[in-house]
From Swiss-Prot:
GO MF annotation: an example: rRNA (cytosine-N4-)-methyltransferase activity
Source organism phylogeny: Bacteria, Pseudomonadati, Pseudomonadota, Gammaproteobacteria, Oceanospirillales
Compartment(s): Cytoplasm
Name this polypeptide is given: Ribosomal RNA small subunit methyltransferase H
Catalytic activity: cytidine(1402) in 16S rRNA + S-adenosyl-L-methionine = N(4)-methylcytidine(1402) in 16S rRNA + S-adenosyl-L-homocysteine + H(+)
One Pfam family cited in the UniProt record for this chain: Methyltransf_5
Length: 309
């Protein structure tokens, strides 16, 4: 775990970089640059010929990248989604990469900066966009979406059992006045939640669901996993840290499917002797007790590693 002056506490820092098996002259991608915690550690292990590409949607991440690593010729940055990493690799004319790291979800600064609109703990404009210059804000969506759509998003992406009640409450509230503030939305969904989970804010699942929807996080993840595996060289590793069950299930299933290969119908007379495309590296890793005590956000972190054959 690393805490730096850029306001972000990096989860599973040593474990993630160790899992990549960084080679001094290797080519690597930090697909979720954030505030550069993982990138800084990867650069420590790279030699003069090694290269690291940082990717992030957030324009503030770009500014941080320039501040931290502008004098390091081994580091490059592209603002965008890791779902487009193959195009960045092609643009750089890299033959492939030796490792890709994805640290999913929202970063500490994004949560802690009220004006970004991610947090239900402090008041701010209801935005939630990783890239504030792209797409609908959360406020625009909750004020225009149909009740059925809101309910579906809360259920599918937040696994919120009171999704229908919350959607109904949101639609009723916006008829009185537009929903434009984070605490305004938090109060609406909390009031529609009759059974608060112990130790969890009643708005947690709703905010998670809306954030995932606004930023197309699961769509990006599905595409990003495919692209990451596609750009890996043989022997290259994909390391993914997820923070909620929806992400982790997708990562687990994708890695399992790659390792097992395509299913062949039992009735086909085919000898299944094709070499595997990939192998799992170890078991899933969780943050240790010491890290969780120091950073409660590490509690839900799960890391999985895949190596291309």
């Amino acid at each position: 775990m690393e805490s730096n002056q850029y306001g972000h506490v990096t989860v599973l820092l040593a474990e993630a970089v160790e899992a990549l098996g960084v080679k001094a002259d290797g080519l690597y991608i930090d697909g979720t640059f954030g505030r550069g915690g993982h990138s800084a550690e990867i650069l420590k292990a790279l030699g003069p010929q090694g290269r690291l590409l940082g990717i992030d949607k957030d324009p503030r991440a770009r500014r941080t990248a320039m501040e931290r690593f502008s004098g390091d010729d081994r580091f490059l940055f592209r603002q965008g989604s890791f779902a487009d990493m193959a195009s960045f690799v092609s643009e750089l004319q890299w033959p492939g990469v030796d490792g890709v790291l994805l640290d999913l979800g929202v970063s500490s600064p994004q949560l802690d900066e009220a004006e970004r609109g991610f947090s239900f703990m402090q008041d701010g404009p209801l935005d939630m966009r990783m890239d504030p210059d792209s797409g609908l804000s959360a406020s625009e969506w909750v004020n225009t979406a149909k009740e059925e759509e809101i309910s579906k998003v809360l259920w599918d992406l937040g696994e919120e059992r009171f999704a229908r009640r919350m959607a109904k409450a949101i639609v009723a509230a916006r008829q009185t006045q537009p929903i434009t503030r984070t605490l305004q939305l938090a109060e609406i969904v909390a009031a529609a939640n009759p059974r608060w989970e112990k130790g969890k804010n009643p708005a947690t699942r709703a905010f998670q669901a809306i954030r995932i929807f606004i930023n197309r996080e699961l769509d990006d993840l599905a595409q990003g996993l495919e692209q990451a595996f596609g750009v890996l060289k043989p022997g290259g590793r994909l390391t993914v840290i997820s923070f909620h069950s929806l992400e982790d299930r997708m990562v687990k299933q994708y890695m399992r499917d790659i390792v097992r290969g395509p299913k062949t119908p039992k009735w086909l007379p085919v000898v299944d002797d094709a070499p595997p495309k990939a192998k799992l590296v170890g078991k899933k890793i969780r943050a240790g007790e010491t890290e969780v005590v120091a950073n409660v956000r590490a509690r839900s972190a799960v890391m999985r590693v895949l190596e291309k054959c």
